[in-house]
């Protein structure tokens, strides 16, 4: 049971202490001031995705990350870290769905957007997960494919 929506809780979107300590941070909670304006709309979109995928569990791989954390990761040589990520603004999630390939999750998110059932600003697919964000966006949804070929 979630405290934001039926299946998602604020804790899932916090930076876990185990990851934070790796780069000299303590566990980082999702900012309270963004819960209603950012996290709740994101979780509502994830609920629609979950329902479309037959109620399968949507696992949050990464939610909110402070910019300083990602900059520390970049300084340590980590690849694939954006200095301007929507994660810094509490508007993004990287996720996996048990039993569903990331390419299918990606296609399903885009289908839901096309049908007008969810509103997102960006969707990207990677080998192991899908990124979904609710960036402010008046134009078309930003999409990308970062899978290895």
Predicted segments with their positions:
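Extracytoplasmic cell-surface/polysaccharide-interacting catalytic and binding patches
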Residues: 1-52, 136, 141, 146-149
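Amphipathic alpha-helical interface surfaces
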Residues: 38, 42-45, 69, 91, ...
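Extended, low-complexity, intrinsically disordered C-terminal regulatory tails
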Residues: 44-77
